[in-house]
């Protein structure tokens, strides 16, 4: 009997054939924590009596409150830097960028098992790795032992065929999946992506889809590793990390869903649940006023996302009543955007370009909303209070829809600007 991608990766990391439903002890290739979870992880690591870090690649990321907006957070970040020096763990600091983007650029390989004290570690699935979020204690154990127990998940096969029409993007695909499955429809399962649309999709778009697998409850969102993966790794200067990795043709899935990409329209997730998804063309008729537009995050803060948004805004300009915030996902994205003149153009259009990091998305700083305000963001979550104010409303959409909304001042279908 064939194996799913999840079963293949766990079999390699356990050292024997394993199947969905088994509880296994597996070695981990990459472990990480960020500044919200890192201090907890470090305290647990010390309390458990560990003296050295045994996971092959261990990282700490200061990205959530970066640069630090208050002294309490500064002290927590200081602890992380000191731990990094003591244990030989690389610390990515203010301005370096968001953990998931950096891991994709520099470290994640197809077939890796990646565990992070951050729920969006599933982003690694875009490169054919099993990335999953875990609690700080579990990650502390991985730091200290290089392994942990896992339950090999059942897999939902998601088949996306056809070609996306102009104005429709990977973000719309994952919002459609959220609409179909609901916010808990894949709890403790893996999503595995197939179909002609996925095969023709670059890794940047695959990362967007894998990033939001957790928003339907999934432990991981797994893409095949193929020539598109090789192209991405070559672009990142590490083609040697490539290996082809796909599920077996006779793999057994818990269930299967099919999506026809050709029929998809731009979608928007309305407050306060990610699965509260509607067509932008319908919502546009309601003329929902938007106060702030945020283009960035680990979901949609890559170079191509900024380029898509700029193309619309450059032609049509920003509405004077909209605050536009742009956040490149990493230092590399920021530098590439600088070299291409993208940052300069955003600034000239009236945008606030912020350092690479998570700040607005997690409601810590650089974009906290006022009471009664509405934001349209390219991020991955819109539950009440996510961006720092429970009395505000968060709408989720693609960079193109975000840009079109910044042009008009209300939620707008981007297809009329393309």
Swiss-Prot record:
* A Pfam family recorded for this sequence: Aconitase
The pathway noted for it is: Amino-acid biosynthesis; L-leucine biosynthesis; L-leucine from 3-methyl-2-oxobutanoate: step 2/4
Catalysed reaction equations from the record: (2R,3S)-3-isopropylmalate = (2S)-2-isopropylmalate
Q: Entry cofactor note text?
A: Binds 1 [4Fe-4S] cluster per subunit.
Q: What keywords tag this UniProt record?
A: 4Fe-4S, Amino-acid biosynthesis, Branched-chain amino acid biosynthesis, Iron, Iron-sulfur, Leucine biosynthesis, Lyase, Metal-binding
Which cofactors are required for activity?
Answer: [4Fe-4S] cluster
What PANTHER family does the entry give?
HOMOACONITASE, MITOCHONDRIAL, HOMOACONITASE, MITOCHONDRIAL-RELATED
Quaternary data: Heterodimer of LeuC and LeuD.
**Protein name per UniProt:** 3-isopropylmalate dehydratase large subunit 1
Q: Which organism is it from?
A: Thermotoga maritima (strain ATCC 43589 / DSM 3109 / JCM 10099 / NBRC 100826 / MSB8)
Q: Which gene encodes it?
A: leuC1
